[in-house]
């Protein structure tokens, strides 16, 4: 495999010009009545206003949503129609579970590299509050049959076959379709398999909240978060509401395990909460950005996706995807100024950190003669991570990209890794560069 170059045929790089997100809100709080499509429109509309770019110049929108709403299956197109862009703007939706907005950003980048577009918007939105509540298979079949009946007798005959349990609503599935295991159960398995203790998990969660709280207090986050006025428009939200600004390590020990009550170590406090929110990034061909006089945040240097088995260690995607992107870009872990890893669970993040430094894991699973290297924790999730900020599934990647680029710029430039696990044994890794 040759060296990866994220450039057009003329040698122009793919620039990230701006990024923005809504505040992230815990399920059933400030965004309790706001569907994901409206969160997406909200953040893209504000992004266009802040960058002062003519919406008609946007060639393409690629957006994602993990928890799909049947009434708006193509969230990207709804965003185009709802934010004043040219009616002919190309728009399509993607999903890669928790790595969705990494995928949408890569899709826009590849369109730029191919010369198909000059300017695109990528991102994702999810609501854990406004969910599609389904019905049982038997009720669904009966409703279809009912629509084809003509007489009262025929209708009664169809309805007579339904029991009380058939009428119960069916919430969205939280388990893997292929295994029946939830993400939390997998995190629990990884903690046990890789010797990640409860104390280590709680310490990472405390670190995440402490660093995120400090980042907000230091004014590092406000510039990438819009003020939202959600329905019913009686109050606004300008900050994430999941961050524990008074986090103490002792407080985490009080919670009971959530997935293995007797022997477990994964709790609600050392996991990401269900969250509502949206995030987006504006990408351009480097030359076009300069023509428009846009300040460039940074560039995509490389990216990789991975897929592994789902029976165990399903959330080890960052280790596999990072190995691929380091190889394709010719970089080493030591070349990186910052490393930002999605914290789905403290157990998952710590297991990956451990495997980055494992020669045995590298030889048996990555095709490497030795480990990628030990992660310098002074470079790792320096502003806190998903455990603190929250995790609207499709929005997290765009949050990480914007947050990382802005922090790199504050530090005078360099290279950074963004990486995430995702359901289905998927993983994503992206190298970002700031001059």
From Swiss-Prot:
The active site is at 98 (acyl-thioester intermediate), 391 (proton acceptor), 421 (proton acceptor). Pathway: Lipid metabolism; fatty acid beta-oxidation. This is 3-ketoacyl-CoA thiolase. GO terms for molecular function: acetyl-CoA C-acyltransferase activity. Belongs to the thiolase-like superfamily. Thiolase family. Heterotetramer of two alpha chains (FadJ) and two beta chains (FadI). GO terms for biological process: fatty acid beta-oxidation. The keyword Cytoplasm applies. Its main location: cytoplasm. It is found in: Cytoplasm. Catalyzes the final step of fatty acid oxidation in which acetyl-CoA is released and the CoA ester of a fatty acid two carbons shorter is formed.
